[in-house]
Amino acid sequence: MADWPVKSLGDKTLLQYAKTPYMDKLARMGRNGRLITVAEGFHPGSEVANMSVLGYNLPKVYEGRGPLEAASIGVDLKPGEMAMRCNLICVEGEILKNHSSGHISTEEADVLIQYLQEKLGNDRVRFHTGVQYRHLLVIKGGNKELDCTPPHDVPLKPFRPLMVKPLVPEAQE
């Protein structure tokens, strides 16, 4: 409910100036506190916060956005398969212009994901179409020791340093 101060209202915002008896009553009767939804050592993404609020033990079960994306599009993961969220992004020159590939439609994205599957997919690597810019990459026997930067966290940055990087030699493949 952020707003700018209005000079004619004594430099108050509209909410500060408004008569708000019901909100005032709620504030008097209510309690507040701090809910920490991101466990120490975890990236503060929505998937982490939501899983935490739902009671999941993140150190035991969290594997990134990939398994959530798989479940959301009906892809059953088998033991030994690694699921990774596969975002379509928009790059202009060397810069990550936006994380949503210019708000690409699911139909347009499906053409690109099917192309990736045709050119790069095999018995070990599979691409699955999701919704709009959010898709899925499944790798059999994939090593999870990777450094992945969520594109929505780094708009307008050079994209090459943000590419997925292996943290151990075994994750190079």
Regions found by a protein language model. Give the residues of each.
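Active-site nucleophile/metal-coordination loop of metallo-enzymes that catalyze phosphate/sulfate
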Residues: A2-V125, Q132
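Glycine-rich, mobile lid/loop segments that gate access to catalytic sites or pores
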Residues: I89, S100-E173
